[in-house]
């Protein structure tokens, strides 16, 4: 029996039959029965015609189910409520909410470390109108601070007079900002229209739901996630970002032969004046170099002569914006991102295993080695150990990240430029690494890979780590529901075959491919 249009538009009896089929399935068949139930009522975030008659049946089924199956049903009820979270008078959401007494009663019989608790907390997070009641009940569980702060945030209503936007993922509790950072947030929030504030608030909420849902779904299927090794919080250690080391064009000059103007693709002149910028004669433009960062997005034309100092000062101001972002990312955000995007809740992939892969697979031929989308430099340091810092150039579009990188690795020059139009000559690079970054520009990933193929010398390696979609539609939804500043419509990952096709079209041959969960590690080589 298949889930077809009869099920999707059927009666409450049909819905009840599907719930009973799930309840009666042998342990080995639970996941398949759950898949059939999910597909009958929900399709990638959209409700089917069977959702309304099915909702009360699923609520009843949760009452009767053992803890393992009840956890799965709680996640499904959360998905049903979420699908119409902002639809006025949604009948499906109302039908799910009518089970509130039963959810709270079931939660009262759970321990905070039991998988069912995660499923119920995700479900309850969709009903801010019951905030006080839910939080009172949950207080007995003594949830970890991160879990509690996520639930608290989802149960809050937007206060248009004092909107608290951003800084909610992976949990509001991890964001402990300085006064300067709070002022920075207030300034950008004040520039938003009421409509933009509402959109941002809802996106923040969806991000937290997506994290909670991914964690709950993993937990009810596979058990309690492995603990992330905790590093001291930047706010507790008093850690500061070392200032990017002072350096001018001299740091980049050893690689001058490989560089090209991003506008006209002509050679760049790195000059003999270490205090100057980098010049394109054909475009009559000078690009500023400040603290070892060449900014190829901010050219100053000869017609604007005299503004070079102003451009450098502007770059310095940008470097000062949210200077601790790199620290937050490496210490607190990246491990959680790997959980969601890579299904790494079991910590199968560790920093040590990533280090080992890079060290053993980056095999450069002659020419500079590019760390593409280098971020805050955690893996730039690993590449430097593998190939030598004197060969390395780090490229990214994020100035706060590059500033952190330069503070940690003063011997490595940095370039602010686009991955979609690499500022390098054809066949000039010895190797390229793009680690945990290709998904940051998913719509243009094929273009970025083509650029890598253009710039690599024959025999040079392209080593990358990124993520593919989960084959389970529920977990795939939680991956996609994450929206970040560069991708407000939601996270976009890849299919493995898509990556292989792009690499082949760029003239590269895959030499190794591996990865647990939804990770993919690939090393390709530029063909002759």
Please provide the spans of the model-predicted regions.
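N-terminal auxiliary segments of SAM/dcSAM-dependent transferases
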Residues: 160, 168-321
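A short acidic, Gly/Pro-enriched loop at the edge of an enzyme's catalytic core
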Residues: 420-432
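A short SAM/SAH-binding and catalytic strip from SAM-dependent methyltransferases
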Residues: 430-444
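Conserved class I S-adenosyl-L-methionine
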Residues: 297-363, 463-490
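Short alpha-helix
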Residues: 490-506
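Class I SAM-dependent methyltransferase SAM/SAH-binding core
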Residues: 368-421
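A short glycine-rich, Lys/Arg-flanked "PGG" loop and its adjoining helix->strand segment in the class I
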Residues: 446-458
């Amino acid at each position: 029996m298949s889930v077809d249009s009869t099920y999707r538009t059927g009666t409450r009896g049909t819905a009840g039959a599907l719930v009973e089929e799930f309840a009666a399935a042998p342990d080995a068949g639970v996941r398949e029965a759950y898949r059939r139930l999910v597909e009958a009522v929900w399709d990638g975030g959209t409700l089917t015609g069977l959702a309304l008659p099915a909702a009360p049946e699923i609520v009843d089924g949760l009452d009767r189910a053992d803890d393992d199956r009840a956890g799965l049903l709680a996640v499904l009820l959360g998905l049903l409520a979420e699908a119409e979270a902002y639809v006025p008078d949604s009948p499906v959401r109302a039908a799910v909410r009518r089970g509130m007494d039963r959810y709270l009663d079931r939660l009262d019989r759970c321990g905070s470390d039991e998988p069912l608790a995660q499923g119920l907390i995700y479900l309850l997070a969709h009903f801010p109108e019951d905030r006080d009641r839910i939080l009172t009940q949950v207080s007995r569980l003594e949830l970890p601070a991160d879990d509690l702060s996520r639930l608290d945030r989802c149960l809050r209503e937007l206060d248009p007079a004092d909107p608290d936007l951003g800084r909610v993922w992976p949990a509001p509790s991890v964001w402990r900002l300085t006064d300067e950072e709070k002022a920075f947030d207030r300034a950008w929030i004040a520039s938003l229209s009421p409509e933009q504030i509402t959109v941002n608030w809802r996106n923040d909420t969806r991000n937290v739901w997506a994290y909670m849902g991914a964690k709950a779904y993993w937990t009810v299927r596979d058990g309690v996630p492995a603990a992330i090794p905790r590093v001291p919080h930047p706010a507790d250690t008093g850690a500061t970002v070392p200032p990017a080391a002072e350096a001018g064009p001299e740091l980049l000059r050893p690689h001058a032969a490989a560089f090209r103007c991003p506008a006209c693709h002509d050679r760049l002149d790195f000059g003999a004046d270490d205090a100057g910028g980098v010049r394109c004669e054909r475009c009559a433009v000078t690009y500023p170099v400040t603290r070892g960062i060449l900014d190829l997005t901010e050219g100053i034309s000869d017609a604007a002569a005299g503004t070079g100092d102003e451009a450098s000062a502007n770059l310095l101001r940008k470097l000062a914006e949210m200077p601790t972002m790199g620290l937050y990312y490496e210490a607190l955000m990246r491990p959680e991102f790997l959980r969601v995007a890579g299904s790494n809740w079991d910590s199968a992939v560790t920093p040590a295993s990533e280090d080992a892969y890079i060290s053993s697979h980056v095999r450069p031929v002659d020419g500079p080695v590019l760390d593409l989308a280098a971020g805050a430099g955690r893996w730039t340091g690993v590449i430097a150990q593998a190939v030598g810092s004197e060969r390395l150039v780090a490229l990214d579009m994020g100035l706060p990240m590059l500033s952190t990188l330069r503070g940690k690795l003063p011997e490595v020059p940095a370039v602010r430029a686009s991955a979609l139009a690499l500022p390098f000559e054809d066949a000039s690079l010895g190797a390229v690494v793009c680690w945990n970054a290709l998904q940051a520009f998913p719509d243009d990933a094929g273009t970025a890979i083509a650029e890598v193929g253009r710039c690599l010398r024959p025999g040079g390696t392209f080593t990358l780590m990124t993520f593919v979609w989960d084959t389970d539609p529920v977990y795939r939804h939680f991956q996609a529901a994450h929206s970040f500043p560069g991708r407000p419509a939601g996270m976009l990952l890849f299919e493995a075959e898509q990556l292989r096709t792009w690499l082949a079209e760029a003239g590269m041959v895959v030499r190794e491919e591996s990865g647990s969960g939804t990770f993919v590690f690939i090393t390709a080589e530029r063909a002759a």
